[in-house]
From Swiss-Prot:
Keyword terms of this UniProt record: Amino-acid biosynthesis, ATP-binding, Kinase, Nucleotide-binding, Threonine biosynthesis, Transferase
GO biological process, one term: threonine biosynthetic process
Organism (species): Bradyrhizobium sp. (strain BTAi1 / ATCC BAA-1182)
MF annotations from Gene Ontology: ATP binding; homoserine kinase activity
Coiled coil regions, renumbered to chain: none
Gene giving rise to this polypeptide: thrB
Keyword Disulfide bond annotated: no
InterPro entries: Aminoglycoside_PTrfase, Homoserine_kinase_II, Kinase-like_dom_sf, Pseudomonas-type_ThrB
Family of the protein in this entry: Belongs to the pseudomonas-type ThrB family.
NCBIfam families named in the record: PRK05231.1, thrB_alt
Pfam family, one: APH
Protein name, per record: Homoserine kinase
Amino acid sequence: MAVYTDVAADELADFLKTYDIGELLSYKGIAEGVENSNFLLHTTKGYFILTLYEKRVAVDDLPYFLGLMAHLAERGVSCPQPARNRDGAVYSTLSGRPAAIINFLEGLWPRKPNVAHCAGVGTALARMHLAGRDFPLVRKNPLSVSGWMSLFAQAADRADTVQAGLSALLSAELDVLARSWPTDLPEGVIHADLFPDNVFFLGDQLSGLIDFPFSCNDILAYDVAICLNAWCFEADHSLNVTKARAFFHAYGRERPLSQAELAALPLLARGAAIRFLLTRLVDWLNVPAGALVKPKDPLEYVRKLRFHQAVTSVRDYGLDGSGATA
């Protein structure tokens, strides 16, 4: 979450009159994250989150994101619920941006994920994948291989200002991924951005999944690979195999990975690393002046990419060939 677009108090108060969530008492911007403008609202009826959708979110995609949250919640997945305005719509316009309000979830995201957190997110991710099987809407992933090529084109001429040789590394890896990306693995609804700051816990108990603007239909095991990268590496960017085992074991109890998914996991993890390396790189090079946001380090994902390039077997992730934890 972040703040790119400021909202005046009187404008916000008028906007809230179109909802039945009480009168505005206070509000503040939320600085974490890099994608949309988010505000914590305190009204006479409680706490809510207001999101103004920015650069990478198309208004035509909002029914998918907001509808998915409602669908998942109905099937027992803890996630925010969109509020409807007095016209029955789940989004409208504020400060020239598409805007939606969701209920506030209790909990904190883990700054230093432990083994229990990794197990919790494994269980929640698998249950989300299963709950999404009958979601009727479909959204193609705009940040898969073709999207990575477009991102690279935006950053290629300046990539080496971030790290010498980065442009060549990205070009070579994108060529491998374009030639080898799997097309026959199980697909469905994925979150596509389930980082620690998008998962709330009360102690070691997971209390909710948030931030769905990258959700789409894609390879389920790719979502697993995104989480492996986001949850199971340490601050020095080394893989914590104990965390990885806990994550995979918990996921597999709910939805076992097939042999084909396991075989593809190293390549999927490379793709997951490239995806976040590129979006972070573009953001790093293009943060708007004065934005209340700290761009995330793209070089973290260079190190993770190189780790996965060196993987020779899923045993390197703490798994044996059957998908059981080694």
